[in-house]
Amino acid sequence: MRLASLLLSLFAASAFAAEPERPNIVFCFADDWGRYAGAYAKIDGRPSLNQVIKTPNIDRIAGEGAIFRHAFVTAPSCTPCRSSLLSGQYFFRTHMGAILNGAKWDSSIPTYPLMLRDAGYHIGKSHKVWSPGTPADAPYGGQKYGYEKAGRKYNNFSENATEMVKAGATFADAKAKLLAEVSGNFQAFLADRKDGKPFCYWFGPTLTHRTYEKHSGVNLWGINPDELKGKLPAFLPDVPEVRDDVADYMGESQAWDAGVGVIIAELEKRGELDKTVFVISGDHGMPGVPAGKCNLYDHGTNVALIVRGPGIKSGRIIDDFVNLMDLAPTFLELGGVQPPAVMTGRSIVPLLKSAQAGQIDASRTWVVTGRERHVGSAREGNLPYPHRALRTKEFLYIRNFAEERWPMGSPKFTSRADLPKFEDLEKVTYTAFADMDASPTKAWVVHHFDDPQYKWVYDHAFGKRPAEELYDLAKDPDQIKNVAADPAYAATLKQMSGQLLTTLKQVEDPRVGPSPVKFELPPFTQPGK
């Protein structure tokens, strides 16, 4: 009997030893950060902001891991994007998680952090995970897993650093003080780890979300706005006011990179970096500018995705189309957990473990993106701006389901006589076009609404849009010339429209289901309740 027990114990021990070690997972996810890193300059293939920005820490992870060319969010709005990512499903399948203002989490929806927790992972988070919405950060287990006692001032980097410098500190000292919060919060999380458990940590600062200290790009980081000449996308006016605003955003992005560097350094110091799958991304494109946040153009939906970790061959550029909802099943697979059938995302572990670069999975040649409602009062009746898009390597097709509505919200003015003040448009989002954040760029474009040279920029940013949009990306990478009505593209239009609607029906998008569509009714149109 003793011999049998001994043999059973030895068998169990050997079986346990044979199990592959589960990696740690660190997810660095910045608010309102699109695809801005030096590592992407070689991918852009044309003059871009990535030729100017300095992101040595993000670039290091890209060089030691894999960088994705075609990574997209399911929705270019904070809460819906995060609902999708955490649940591994399209945003429109997450009920009240599909909107921003008024979002409520349905606890019956499985999420990867809580599933990893139940599988033995030590989980934790710092700063923004799922917000705005109630209960706060519910898909991550609420504030129980929050680590922020070292401070939150890093989230408003430019404002706080500028204040310290004005008080007599050097920028180096101000930067070090703010970055000490990042390390302190991460160290507190690691200190709570028990019995060598694998850990799953979410680092989600909001410094790249507006507002920024004006001129901080040049004053703190030495980013000369004139260096951006000829490097802005075509739909952004290449004028001093806009270049200065974009330089400020780039400064916050460089502060984000510095925070990522702190996390890397702490892992290295503890000998954990090579045991960790390290992922970097953002929840949508640049805020407060035309075609960015809240838009289905690439400037709003195409984001950075960079992954380093054990078994991931370094130095690869991956061309497969991926959606950030694919990360939930990916993290679960890495943690040895079977993704639930309800997840519509597909694990990218096969792409990460492949030795190939370029196109790896022949089926990954497109993604679907979309949006319903962002802020509550952008349009009368708190109505959404419903649209969906199909993106392939060659084309972007957009279906606007309510072309009579204003895509960025109501103008709230009719002529120069009642035009809002520049300062109000610069600082108060709800002044006009409330689905675009307040910014100097927004104010400049609105104030040039009747300027013959820039009227097209204003119309492209804020004007009503036709039911269908189609862009030929080889000829029009900035997606300015809509060719949906061009007979030469009739076959492409039909094919992409059909593929989009078929896909939406397959994944049970309410927008193409029975009428009335729930997103047009309470509680979705009651953001305050």
Name each model-derived stretch.
Residues R2-L3, F11, F16-E469, P477-G498, ...:
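Formylglycine-dependent sulfatase
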Residues D472:
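A contiguous binding-surface segment within folded domains or other stable secondary-structure elements
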Residues K505-E508:
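Short arginine-rich
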